[in-house]
Amino acid sequence: MNLDFLSLSDKHNSVVVLGATATGKTSYAVGLAKELGGEIISADSRQVYKGLDLGTGKDLKEYGDVPHHLIDICTLEREYNVFDFQNDAYKAFEDIKRRKKLPIFAGGTGLYLDSLIREYELIPVPKNEELRASLAGKDLTELQKFFFEYNVPMHNKTDLENMDRLMRAIEIAEYKKTHPDAAEILNANRPDIRPLIIGLKYPREILRERIRLRLLERIKDGMIEETESLHKEGFSWERLESLGLEYKFTAQYLQGKIKSREEYVDSLYRAICQFAKRQETWFRRMEKNGVKINWVLK
């Protein structure tokens, strides 16, 4: 591996390997870990779940003897989120540093990575039943207007389109307003993460072909059967669809919502390509917010 540009000094105490889906992040991170004595912290919103293997590209053999963290840490009964990730990633980072190894964050979930790099203030906020009762009956537009009155940043703008998430955002904004010292307490206990950030990128047409070939390989290896098995274990179609992409389209295909295998493969392929574009957009936004990404064109 060519590490000529990789200069880890006192300025950096960790590495981030990011990129769109199918850019080879895990393989690259494993190579770095072997060269630099590192351990990998996964930043993938679905690889945290046990049982989501083929659909998430969770190839544990690829890690070899390189230690990895935040993979297979919870079951599908639980909704894992960015707050959980930030806390778990902090713990993994400190554990790795205590053992004098190099933490390497690797993944494509931009929200998760951004929460570490730009230090989102994610505070444990209890439910406010009184506030929820006062807002009951308001429609989405009214809740959005109410939220904007707090004048606080929204890290994930899709939360504005979901009633439950928007209600939670209002709850958090109200808590911060009434507990102004909460963020200071959080920041005082936050580990000092100063990563060198490496971004992997392929030309568009090559990336699309990599996505296509990988999808066909996953289907051949049993991704449809994996999804069917999860449903037989008791997980609803709705839960599987909520996981997005591979599990969403495969669940729809198994239910007969997608009529043919050809339509299933084509629809899923196009959705993954669109997802890759959204990931690239997220990383560009991170750069606009001052995050320095060292891009490696593959």
UniProtKB/Swiss-Prot annotation:
Its cofactor is Mg(2+). The keyword Transferase applies. ATP binds at G19, A20, T21, A22, T23, G24, K25, T26. The record marks T109 as: Interaction with substrate tRNA. It holds the Pfam family IPPT. GO terms for biological process: tRNA modification. Residues 44-47 are annotated as: Interaction with substrate tRNA. InterPro entries: Dimethylallyltransferase, IPT, P-loop_NTPase. Its EC number is 2.5.1.75. Substrate binds at T21, A22, T23, G24, K25, T26. It is an enzyme of class 2 (transferase). GO terms for molecular function: ATP binding; tRNA dimethylallyltransferase activity. Keywords: ATP-binding, Magnesium, Nucleotide-binding, Transferase, tRNA processing. The keyword ATP-binding applies. NCBIfam families: miaA. Monomer. Catalyzes the transfer of a dimethylallyl group onto the adenine at position 37 in tRNAs that read codons beginning with uridine, leading to the formation of N6-(dimethylallyl)adenosine (i(6)A). Belongs to the IPP transferase family. This is tRNA dimethylallyltransferase 2. It comes from Treponema denticola (strain ATCC 35405 / DSM 14222 / CIP 103919 / JCM 8153 / KCTC 15104). The lineage of its organism: Bacteria, Pseudomonadati, Spirochaetota, Spirochaetia, Spirochaetales. The gene is miaA2.
